[in-house]
Amino acid sequence: MPAPQRKHRRGGFSHRCFPTPQTAMTPQPAGPPDGGWGWVVAAAAFAINGLSYGLLRSLGLAFPDLAEHFDRSAQDTAWISALALAVQQAASPVGSALSTRWGARPVVMVGGVLASLGFVFSAFASDLLHLYLGLGLLAGFGWALVFAPALGTLSRYFSRRRVLAVGLALTGNGASSLLLAPALQLLLDTFGWRGALLLLGAITLHLTPCGALLLPLVLPGDPPAPPRSPLAALGLSLFTRRAFSIFALGTALVGGGYFVPYVHLAPHALDRGLGGYGAALVVAVAAMGDAGARLVCGWLADQGWVPLPRLLAVFGALTGLGLWVVGLVPVVGGEESWGGPLLAAAVAYGLSAGSYAPLVFGVLPGLVGVGGVVQATGLVMMLMSLGGLLGPPLSGFLRDETGDFTASFLLSGSLILSGSFIYIGLPRALPSCGPASPPATPPPETGELLPAPQAVLLSPGGPGSTLDTTC
């Protein structure tokens, strides 16, 4: 007898580089698993955040060696990190669009390779321009491909513990800074700046296996096929939603003041009379308060005691007020002083700023639906980058005009307070705050992705995406 012919089903494998979850042998969950492999994704996002933002913050240790080798000013070498940060933030929507089209896993893996090549290319630089191209453009674009897709994938794995998971991932920045800063100094002392950049390229390549851990997850309401139009993949249609537009405007204003302490907190402490070690302590306690608050606020937000939009407005306002206090602290002593008042103000600022950070990304699924989280994350990072590029230079200009950083921190705090005031309008922009209306589809078909009450979104997540409309 002739052997029976096998019938091959069409669509057994995706056009992507990896099988889609529909083809997996195990059944898919009806909603986010809220744990399980999601914690592996959280650990991967933690490492991705550390190997991008944490490494970027530590690069400044190599700038004195670069300035001496190329006989350039400190301002010229500072443009390396400024360019890398600008490219990383501004190109984040590109990473989101590619992730929406091809999946987060291959995009993050490619981003890790590009970032690593940027360091390797820079290790052979014969001019500072080569460092601008290698670290600023190539590595910066590689980092742009990793952060938003990783954070968006993480948000899809969690519902009740989403903000806690996001807060855990965001602590990778501070944790890696504590480890990479002394490690980079050791590499510079041992191998010089060229050898250090080569080894940093090898370390950065670990972004690729981290990306391999971002397994795709199909949720109810996901569109049957990814968008083919570049504009649709960028998610610009999200700005047609009133709630997201309000959130975007507030976040852009907050970005104008949020990054100023990253650049000018230590110089401000020196202006207030502290020595180098005292200024370093001020920065350190602010960073530790920031990291701890991200976890605590993530847990608090997931308890559901206070709606996320209200928490976002409250902690945003506290961050702005904290910067006011930091700016108004008087002269605290000489170089031997530890600066008690400024130290206390820095702790208060760090706690409030750290509490704000996970809420920015944790509130997105409630505004755009789980299906639009990756696109929304890229757009939010781009908006914050616009404010981040304007805030520190304006702060430095005010310092030059007034002689200290008081006006700079007052303006930064005012920008954050303005953005937080705009956040107050978020609950009224959500559908459930208007007249009650029946859901478009029966509740069993939507999946319990977020705590009730919920509303069905038709795009970008498709029918069945959920919206946290708690006011």
Swiss-Prot record:
Q: Show the Pfam families listed in the entry.
A: MFS_1
Q: Which first-to-last residue range defines the signal peptide?
A: none
According to the record, the segments passing through the membrane are 36-56, 78-98, 106-126, 131-151, 163-183, 198-218, 243-263, 273-293, 312-332, 333-353, 367-389, 407-427
Task: Identify the stretch(es) annotated as Disordered.
Answer: 1-31
Biased segments, Low complexity type: 19-28
Location in or out of the cell = Endoplasmic reticulum membrane; Cell membrane
Q: In which tissues is it expressed?
A: Expressed in liver, salivary gland and thyroid.
Compositional bias of kind Basic residues: 1-13
Question: Where, in residue ranges, is this chain on the Cytoplasmic side?
Answer: 1-35, 428-471
One GO-annotated biological process of the protein? lipid metabolic process
A cellular-component GO term for this protein: plasma membrane
Q: What is the protein's membrane topology class?
A: Multi-pass membrane protein
The keyword Endoplasmic reticulum appears for this protein: yes
Catalytic activity annotation: pyruvate(out) + H(+)(out) = pyruvate(in) + H(+)(in)
Predominant location category: endoplasmic reticulum
Keywords, alphabetical: Cell membrane, Diabetes mellitus, Endoplasmic reticulum, Lipid metabolism, Membrane, Symport, Transmembrane, Transmembrane helix, Transport
Single Gene Ontology MF annotation: pyruvate transmembrane transporter activity
Q: Which family does it belong to?
A: Belongs to the major facilitator superfamily. Monocarboxylate porter (TC 2.A.1.13) family.
Disease tied to this protein: Type 2 diabetes mellitus: A multifactorial disorder of glucose homeostasis caused by a lack of sensitivity to insulin. Affected individuals usually have an obese body habitus and manifestations of a metabolic syndrome characterized by diabetes, insulin resistance, hypertension and hypertriglyceridemia. The disease results in long-term complications that affect the eyes, kidneys, nerves, and blood vessels.
Question: What subunit structure does UniProt give?
Answer: Interacts with isoform 2 of BSG.
Stated role: Proton-linked monocarboxylate transporter. It catalyzes the transport of pyruvate across the plasma membrane. Probably involved in hepatic lipid metabolism: overexpression results in an increase of triacylglycerol(TAG) levels, small increases in intracellular diacylglycerols and decreases in lysophosphatidylcholine, cholesterol ester and sphingomyelin lipids.
In its UniProt entry, what is this protein called?
Monocarboxylate transporter 11
Origin species: Homo sapiens
